Amino acid sequence: MQEIQKNTKKEQYNLNKLQKRLRRNVGEAIADFNMIEEGDRIMVCLSGGKDSYTMLEILRNLQQSAPINFSLVAVNLDQKQPGFPEHILPAYLEQLGVEYKIVEENTYGIVKEKIPEGKTTCSLCSRLRRGILYRTATELGATKIALGHHRDDILQTLFLNMFYGGKMKGMPPKLMSDDGKHIVIRPLAYCREKDIVRFAEAKAFPIIPCNLCGSQPNLQRQVIADMLRDWDKRYPGRIETMFSAMQNVVPSHLCDTNLFDFKGITHGSEVVDGGDLAFDREEIPLQPAGWQPEEDDTSLEALRLDVIEVK
């Protein structure tokens, strides 16, 4: 009996610690990008997956202690996919006492009618879903639309665009919507997926399967996701360093003439961003930028990234 109580206390301690980390990550993202302002009405897009459940939970938690007042309304789009458990989200949200709206639109039928069997349906489905959510935000008087993409999603998108699209383009934590009428925010931008997975399991959220439409997963994105997970296991800190790099861009040391006036450099021009350090031996920090070891991590020396000097 004592052993059970001991385990329960430890589980609660770990859950509290995890929730504090997620809350801190979300709070920092909100502050860094001015995501939420006084009087905002936030439309929280709830899919029934781990990410959106976590986003709603953390925003509700922050709402109680934030120095500003803002309201939340959860929105789920029932796309009439076969087997969709339409009772789960209303029951969950009513239990929490959260204002919500279930939008019923048969986008599944439209996609099946327009897209030939065997072809990818995700592109059309996304466009339809986006338009419905924008319309719903207007109807509800929402000032911001919150999506549940996290740090790993942002990095995956960056590598997808680099590997397949020839662009250095990620997924912004805050942006103006396609129709120019709504501000979209991603409060989980600084949150690690593995933290969200653990939090969702500990909270026992009623997860709704994401493959009800029968579509295949994005294989290219899956390859990138597997690559990042492998790096995270083999080289602790690499993911954090890459995300830090997205926040420390030096246009003068890249090749985009739209971001920096290379043609304007002439004799007498001032040195920009340290000039050319290509021939200098660069000091590699022992601890990867942006990485904070967990309490149960082994020694920092053992976890140091492998550094290969290119000559």
Swiss-Prot record:
Miscellaneous field: The thiolation reaction likely consists of two steps: a first activation step by ATP to form an adenylated intermediate of the target base of tRNA, and a second nucleophilic substitution step of the sulfur (S) atom supplied by the hydrosulfide attached to the Fe-S cluster.
Protein name: tRNA-cytidine(32) 2-sulfurtransferase
Catalytic activity from the UniProt record: cytidine(32) in tRNA + S-sulfanyl-L-cysteinyl-[cysteine desulfurase] + AH2 + ATP = 2-thiocytidine(32) in tRNA + L-cysteinyl-[cysteine desulfurase] + A + AMP + diphosphate + H(+)
Taxonomic placement: Bacteria, Pseudomonadati, Pseudomonadota, Gammaproteobacteria, Enterobacterales
Motif (PP-loop motif): 47-52
Textual note on the cofactor: Binds 1 [4Fe-4S] cluster per subunit. The cluster is chelated by three Cys residues, the fourth Fe has a free coordination site that may bind a sulfur atom transferred from the persulfide of IscS.
Subunit note: Homodimer.
Family: Belongs to the TtcA family.
